[in-house]
Amino acid sequence: MDRHFWFGKWIGDDQLSERLDALPGLMDSVLTAPFPFDSMLEAADKLADDLAQDTAIKKLLLDKALETTARQDAEQMLEATAAMLRKEAMLQKLRSELGVSHPGIPCRRYPHRQFEAWYPVGCVVHVMPSNVFAVAALGLIEGLLVGNINIVKLSVRDSTFAALFAESLCTRDISGRLQNYMAVIRTSSADQNRMQALFAQADAISAWGGERAISAVRASAAEGTRVIAWGHKISFNYVAAECLDDAELRNKALDGAAKDVCRLDQQACSSPQTLFVEGGQAEAESFARDLAERLGHISPGIPGQLPDEAEQAEITTVLNVANAEESLGLTRVFEDKHSKRWRVILDKRPGLKPSPLFRTIFVKAIQRQNIVKTLRPMRTWLQTCGLACGLKSLAELSRAFLSAGVTRITRAGEMVDSYLGAPHDGVYALTQLARRVSIDGPPAAEGIGTITQLEGCMESAPTETPILKKKEFQARATAVKQAHLMFQSGGSSGQTVFSTFSWDDYHDQMRAAGHGLVAAGLDPARDCVMNLFFSGHMYGSFISFWSILESLRVRQVPMGMIQDQAEITDKILLTGSNVLIGLPSHLVPLLESNRTQLAGRIKKIFYGGERMTRAQYRFLTESCNVSVVRSAVYGSNDAGPMGYQCPYCKGTVHHLMTDLQTLEIVDMEEDIPVSEGEVGRLIFTSRARQYPEVTRYEIGDTGRWIGGKCACGRLDPRFELSGRTGDAFKAGGPFFNYRKFVNLLDEGLEYTGPVQVHVREEGNTILLELWLAEGHAITAEAAERVLREQYAELEISKEAALAFKFQVCLVPFERFKRVTASGKIKPVCDHRTEIA
């Protein structure tokens, strides 16, 4: 019978030894390949969906769990397992424990040149406790999150739950590679040949159990192997003196302690076994009596399991001894006389005492000054303190407990509860399953932000999903409740819309954009950057680049897009800024007007928000001697950063940010991939956006793939931007919308003739010319006045002193430019020349 799930296949016990002998070859081939991280997250999230519904896999896993666990506990554990598998939960765990959302990627330690990363240890053998199915699933997921090869070792008595769980992840993995990282075997720890073969390939052994079991693992582990021990722990309640006399605090402490004693029948390491009362014996006895009364009310309402014969025998023995010692004045027993479900034992001797569990609690008096002396001898076994106290005692008591060896302090009544990303037994599990690595590359690597730029590992796009249009995306964004961060769109839709982000997603994307800025030529260790992007009105450019520059730890001068060129020039000279970032239509007039003062000062310009024309580029490089003029980032409020330039990217050519995005280029008319070199619509899928989800989003830009390898050495694919689709276009800063011009003329002047937009260059200035047809009882002046009054972006460009002009022209109807194929009037004609 097949009993082991061995890297995607079920095998019989007679095959296991042979497979163990072949492990070294498997390790060599798997560990050198990039881990399928995104596919793992998606597979886990799909399994979470299935476990949240009445599905066949949920029924199968529940049936297997019921072989060793009571139904209520099995259902609760399965529910907790499903919650753990959520993509959002796993990313939060990574961020909490490792500080990154994607381990295994060496990133620059800005402003320095070295790279660091959390990297998998390699092969992790998980030696799991018997009959605790959820622990095996948790251990497997934690190992996968870091990118390890995982072999879960269970006892022969365990069910096939963990193996079926692993198989379920594999069947939901679209990459087909996740199976190479998972095996679940059921074998006896007494089989030394197998255990030695298994441990010989382990880079780390994560072992659960008592002292004897952990010692056996350490003795069998190869020299230098990391042994991660998850041993038995002991926990307790503590009631501070101020909770004894205040009726409200006392009631809360009693309720909390009673719940802690009953929940899970004290089977968790975080369940209390002793309750300390701060004070003398009289206070302890009074609290014990009240606790017994409170248990009589609370215990019947909390379902539990009955002890087996051996466990009941231990309880009986402890009670018999306590009853005998009562005559000596050492103890007093308060017991459930009806159902025998709980018991409180007042013990007048000091010290933390283990309980026989199943709702059995010792109560002891203690003085605050004796906390450390009493508890520290047990420091290696201490875990949780369920603390009932007022605010005035919190700091002092917390310091005492933590000094004694406690690793976790909770509110009374919540000892077995936890939160996402919480440490376990004083450590983060993921740091135990990972290693911190560093790389100091050759001088050529100083322009590289992440090593993945040299690997070019773009994930496949989910082509079975329909393409997401702008209106649908905006509906998703509007549906997001309580977004952490909101930006106003630049206006490409012609309406006020918002883009929403979680803080985690935002910072991930800004860090990636920072890597792109370094690729473009920014030197975080030496440059000083003046941020001249527009701020206010909920626009994202200034604040986003503030965050980008902060992530690079580069010197920043946060000036903003102010109109006072003299002040900007003065601050450039005072601060020694040698790099400017902002809109071309703002930067070019600044250098035109102050060329003498700024001569030789500005070495680099990184632009964004609009196109850089050939004339502007030539002016900056030839007349102003700026040595580097490149795109700061290709991005949008909707999809975030999407592309970056390197020194070999000319014009609108960008490398794709594969850490964040996947890209498809589809036909202009049909949703099919374009032929090689053809221009099509850009379709982005974000790999780093939880809400709103960005899947196959038509961003509104057109472009084409650039074949071949880039001379910079990066393998991130390249694409060239060609223009915009639909009614939106950029000119002199903000987005403008053709349809909005038409609607304003219709509503304000009842103009019904044709409208055509022409965007031109006049030296370094952008001219937006709006053509209306002659003979419609309308003047150019009236039309321009209405549009300036009603279209705020026109005034923003004027107020910001951008190199931008707007004018309305009345022209003969026959002069309007038309689409050759259809004869239709072309809405937008862009006559600008871009950078060569």
Predicted segments, located by residue:
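Active-site glycine/GP-rich loop and adjacent strand/helix microenvironment
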Residues: 1-26, 30-33, 38, 197-457, ...
